[in-house]
Every structure is written in C-alpha cells, then in structure tokens.
Amino acid sequence: SAKKIAYAASFGGSEVLPNDKENIKKWLKRYDKITIRENSGVKIANELGVPAEQVLDPTFLLEKSEWEKLIPQRECSEKYVLVYQLHPNKQFDEYAKQYAKKKGLKLYRLSHCFHHIVRSGKFVCCPPIGEFLWYIKNAEHFLTDSFHGTALTHNLPMFCQRVTAKESQVFFSLSATKTEYSKATTTLTLTAKK
C-alpha cells in the first residue's frame, strides 16, 4: 500500500485539548512520516509519542517568479487598500476602514469566512490562489493579521497586525525567540516598503 506522508501540517495553535489527545495520537499514527511547519506542533506531536520534524512552510518552496506565474494577466481599474484578516478584532476592522478613508482609497476584503461580508469594504469570498495573489499585487496597501498573507506579499506597503501566541504560532516559529519577534513587530507595524 502507498505510504502516507504529511508535509508541513499544522495543529493551528500551540496546544491541544486534553480530551482530544488520544484521538489525535491515533490519527497521527496512521501516517508513515509527519512533518510540521511550527515548532510548537513538533512539540505537540513528540509529547503524544509521534515522531515529527519541522519543515519550511510551503509558501517558501516557490520563488517569487513561480508565484507570479499564477497571477491572472489583467489590468486593475481602481486603487484600493486590501485587508486579509483571519482573527476577529473590531479595532483592526475600524483601523482598516479609517486607513482606507485617510488614503482616499476603496477598501477590499479577502476572506474564506462568508460572515465577513458584513464588514466594511468590498467583499471577495474564497478567491482561488491566482486571484488572491492578483488582489495583493494590485493593492496600494495591504493590511493583514495572517502569516500566509504576510509571506505572499512581495515589496508592497503593508501592515501586519500582531496576534497572540495562541492565535499564531507560525509567526513565533519563524523567529529565533519570542523576544526577537516582539522587537521586530508591534500592533499594526509597517513591515515592508516599496
């Protein structure tokens, strides 16, 4: 039978509920090899008695030029501020609205959550990866609280909202220590410039 390998899996946080541990252990043991993108996930797997190693997040496996091949070749007819927000945060919502207003630009939101349709701005639900990248590439400014949103931004003025360790171990896994992470980012910090 074919081998089962999990590449760059994620637990989505830094811990699992005690009641879930036995089931998770049972499910993980179905795999011949497990690799995880966050160091906290490797720790969880190892604590469950399942060997795992940390690997590079898949977003970094392609060069910028490879990602760009996925972007549709069409013109953008308007200027906008783009928001890709994963975690509920009214302060971030208000900031995005005011930021777009201050810049005199339209506000666009990309989301996989249909309930985000009620937030301010034009809502784009679940765009395929090429469209997702097209919106990022054509944005005048990009606001996000997402690791993957940050990773796929290439030389674009952007803000990344700091999230808690529980919400996003990915950010912490990319830096050597939490102290370095804290020095490098603060809430709504400018992280890239053209």
Model regions and ranges:
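Active-site anion-handling motifs in enzyme catalytic cores
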Residues: S1-K194
